[in-house]
Amino acid sequence: MCIRDSLNYGVIGNCRTAALISEKGNIEWLCFPDFDSPSIFASLLDRDKGGCFGFEVSNEYRISQSYVPHTNILSTHFSSDEGEFVVLDFMPCYRSYEKEHYLPAEIYRYIRWIKGTPRFKVNYNPAPDYARGKVIHNITDEYIETYCSSENKDRQYLYSSLSLQDIEQKKEITLQRDEFFLLSYNEKVIPIDIEREKLEYCRTLVYWLNWTNRTKKYSLYNDVIERSLLVLKLMSYYNGAVLAALTTSLPETVGDVRNWDYRFCWLRDASMSIETLFQIGHAGAARRFMKFIQSTFVAKHESFQIMYGIRGERQLKEIILDHLDGYKNSKPVRIGTVSYTHLRAHETRHDL
């Protein structure tokens, strides 16, 4: 079971998917390989069945969280009298040698040893496909492969410099040097080690520093504005679509039934986000958004819908997941939406 701390989450992402990480360093929401794909971890919506990935430490540890300045790399700091370490969470995001953006469905968890002999247990508890089936693990010398009986085509691979057996058996680990985890949607061809992890960290760090450097600066509240813009960037799909939210089924009122899936692109809301990014120096976001809108026209006389799937899908469906309890028992949990059938005249004014 994953114990939910609060609704104070850090978010990491790479314009393909995103993860919500609690104040104690637990990944409680993650969909692979894309924003609207089935969840791997969803304890946000069901503490018992949803699945999470985190660190168990004694109550003596003090835990704090912040972002690496000017980036979407999240730092969770663990300290006690016995030792101290930091977990740096990020998704690789940078331009490759071919000048294309490299946005793999991957999460790195870089464990940086600071001092002493800190101890922890790893709680690796994936529940693929929205926890709709039995979870199956295969442990090899290189990785832990995980898939779900309800959807065995989608598989996740956990690589680590730590003992995979110790991780699987939840044994206590004493940290003596830098270590890492890599959770990937694909089996890796190249060797995965701590040096590779550091390279991916540096590339991603430089990408975000360059992105914020191109952003307009303000004399007042610049840090708050910059952080808000970084979040807006994370909610953008690489093709230009902008999501209304990174999650599904968080209730408008706890205990109520108005729980919707917002992992889609509503044109009015997206236009406001794009206008903001354009005004502060990111014209490329506006160009990608316009290309996305153009891609939704599949015939000469097509009309606007109020919203689309993040790949431009015009027809969507909604499914209710009865087996999940929902956030604070707020049922139902929904995936998908039928909001595309709604018609509101004011929705396209802002786009124009």
Residue spans for each PLM region:
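Acidic, mature catalytic/reactive cores of soluble proteins
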Residues: 4-344
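Positively charged, low-complexity/disordered segments
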Residues: 345-352
